[in-house]
A protein has these predicted regions:
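A short, surface-exposed alpha-helical micro-motif characterized by mixed small hydrophobic
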Residues: 211-213
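C-terminal boundary and immediately downstream tail of ABC-type ATPase nucleotide-binding domains
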Residues: 87, 237-274, 297
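A short, proline-enriched helix->beta-strand linker immediately N-terminal to the Walker B motif
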Residues: 163-167
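Conserved ABC transporter NBD signature motif
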Residues: 57-68
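Hydrophobic anchor residue at the start of the ABC signature
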Residues: 106, 158, 169, 182, ...
Length: 298
């Protein structure tokens, strides 16, 4: 399944947020979208998901597997979210329900889109948690979000987005809210799992080295417009061929690298990852009540 966007324009009130966006995400490709704050990159992801603010005006086409999403009913969009297109948000602390056990949250898309119940549902929850390399999946399933670490919460969020086997995953700054020592582990996991499954990835960030590490192709957005759409190798090897905005982003990344080099430090996105349970990712306190045991997969 592929995503095709043609001449997409979005207005919020009088503000023209996205201006003539045209792009393709072929089946199985990893595409990075980079831009500064306010460039419109996150608004693009919300437009694809049909989650724009009330009152937004949209013109153009967003075509998913031959289906037009602009103007589609909420019912039709809801049937696509999670089952075919999923989104991983920036901060798992806000994207997860703080009052619901994590196992129950993973169960939601499995029930809704795959119709699983009983033992089949419990097995699917365990598989989803194991796939994202969480230690002691049974404990994680019966825990509330505040009882596990930030890195573990983001892994749970990844498990939720992939639970119903979508064909496209949109990841909007998925590691920004994490401690730098955990970021690489989560990025490696996201890249590995999506490539193994053949899932298309739309990876949104302001950090060029991270985008270049995750993507096959890089799209630069500036002031609501696409200024560059190039293979990732061009960003590394031929920056002089890029637009002024892309060169500015590349220059800032090189300057930051030189600062880290001068002070003898390692850039956060280049730090070695930590295996589950090693220093760098707190495991959180285990949920221990018998009530947790009974309710983990209800």
């Amino acid at each position: 399944m592929s995503l095709s966007i043609t001449d997409l324009n979005v207005w919020i009130g009088d503000a023209h947020i996205l201006r003539g966006i045209t792009l393709e995400v072929p089946d199985g490709q990893h595409v990075g979208i980079i831009g500064s704050s306010g460039s419109g990159k996150s608004m693009l992801s919300l437009a694809i998901m049909g989650l724009l603010p009330e009152g937004a005006r949209v013109e153009g086409s967003i075509c998913w597997d031959g289906r037009e999403l602009v103007g589609a009913s909420e019912r039709d969009l809801r049937s696509l979210r999670g089952s075919q297109i999923s989104m991983m948000f920036q901060d798992p602390a806000t994207s997860l329900d703080p009052l619901m056990r994590l196992g129950k949250q993973i169960a939601l898309p499995l029930r809704r889109h795959r119709g699983l119940r009983g033992a089949d549902l419990r097995e699917a929850i365990d598989r989803a948690l194991a796939e994202v390399a969480l230690p002691d999946p049974a404990r994680i399933a019966r825990s509330f979000p505040y009882e596990v670490s930030g890195g573990q919460r983001q892994r749970v969020a990844l498990a939720m987005t992939l639970a119903a086997s979508p064909s496209l995953l949109i990841a909007d700054e998925p590691t920004t809210a994490l401690d730098v020592t955990v970021q690489r582990t989560v990025l490696d996991l996201l890249d590995e799992v999506t490539r193994e499954r053949g899932v298309s990835l739309l990876f949104i960030s302001h950090d060029l080295p991270v985008v270049a590490r995750m993507a096959d192709r890089v799209i630069v957005v500036d002031a609501g417009r696409i200024t560059d759409d190039v293979p990732v190798e061009v960003i590394r090897s031929a920056p002089d061929t890029l637009s002024d905005s892309a060169r500015s982003i590349a220059s800032a990344a090189r300057a930051l690298d030189s600062v880290f080099e001068r002070i003898g430090a390692v850039r956060p996105d280049s730090q070695p990852g930590h295996a589950p349970g090693e220093a760098g990712e707190c495991e959180g306190e285990p949920a221990s009540s018998t009530d947790n045991e009974r309710n983990a997969h209800e």
